[in-house]
């Protein structure tokens, strides 16, 4: 199955451009979310380096962000670049569990391979297994309780486009493979 950037951009924009004034945009080296302003009249999710996986990851952050956070650059997240200590890495991972669980669900809906991201290439991520397990536990919660409205809208659109199974089947989520 081929995953084209034009497709994920079109799917996202069809789902959310009108109601949320938000577009998915191929960006440069670093991803960023910028709310609408005087120069750009729409909210923009810029994903990095033309990677499909980056698009899914940045979308997941947008899906987690509430209405007020979507008014802030990068949703008001603190970000500490690569080279984080193991302790700071654990703090980083706490805010990544829900977005990465959604990213995994969306990737599965698109028939795309998901890999958990410690996003700390120049630092010591330490043992990432507890983080991966936490992401899996959040997937289980979403499977049981349902996805937030915007996430479910996009999941359904991906399922329709890629002709994948229309449910969150936990048998397709193997924490040892991420």
Curated annotation (Swiss-Prot):
Coiled coil: none
Alphabetized GO MF terms: monooxygenase activity
Pfam families for the chain: EpmC
Enzyme Commission code(s) on record: 1.14.13.-
The reaction(s) this protein catalyses: N(6)-((3R)-3,6-diaminohexanoyl)-L-lysyl-[protein] + NADPH + O2 + H(+) = N(6)-((3R)-3,6-diaminohexanoyl)-5-hydroxy-L-lysyl-[protein] + NADP(+) + H2O
InterPro entries: EpmC
Keywords per UniProt: Monooxygenase, Oxidoreductase
Enzyme class of the recorded protein, top EC level: oxidoreductase
Job description of the protein: Is involved in the final hydroxylation step of the post-translational modification of translation elongation factor P (EF-P) on 'Lys-34'. Acts after beta-lysylation of 'Lys-34' by EpmA and EpmB. EpmC adds an oxygen atom to the C5 position of 'Lys-34' and does not modify the added beta-lysine.
Family per record: Belongs to the EpmC family.
Protein name, UniProt field: Elongation factor P lysine hydroxylase
């Amino acid at each position: 199955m081929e995953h084209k950037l034009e497709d994920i951009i079109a799917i996202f924009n069809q789902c959310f451009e009108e109601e949320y004034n938000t577009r998915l945009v191929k960006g440069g080296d670093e991803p960023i979310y910028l709310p609408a302003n005087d120069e750009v009249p729409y909210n923009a999710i810029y994903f990095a380096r033309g990677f499909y996986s980056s698009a899914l990851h940045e979308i997941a952050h947008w899906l987690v962000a509430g209405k007020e956070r979507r008014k802030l650059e990068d949703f008001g997240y603190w970000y500490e670049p690569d080279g984080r200590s193991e302790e700071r890495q654990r703090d980083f991972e706490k805010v990544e569990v829900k977005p990465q669980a959604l990213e995994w669900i969306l990737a599965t809906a698109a028939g795309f391979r998901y890999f958990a991201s410690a996003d700390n290439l120049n630092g010591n991520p330490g043992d990432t297994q507890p983080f991966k397990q936490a992401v899996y536990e959040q997937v289980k919660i979403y499977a049981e309780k349902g996805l937030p409205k915007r996430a479910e809208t996009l999941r359904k659109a991906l399922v329709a486009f890629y002709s994948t199974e229309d449910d969150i089947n936990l048998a397709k989520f193997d924490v040892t493979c991420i």
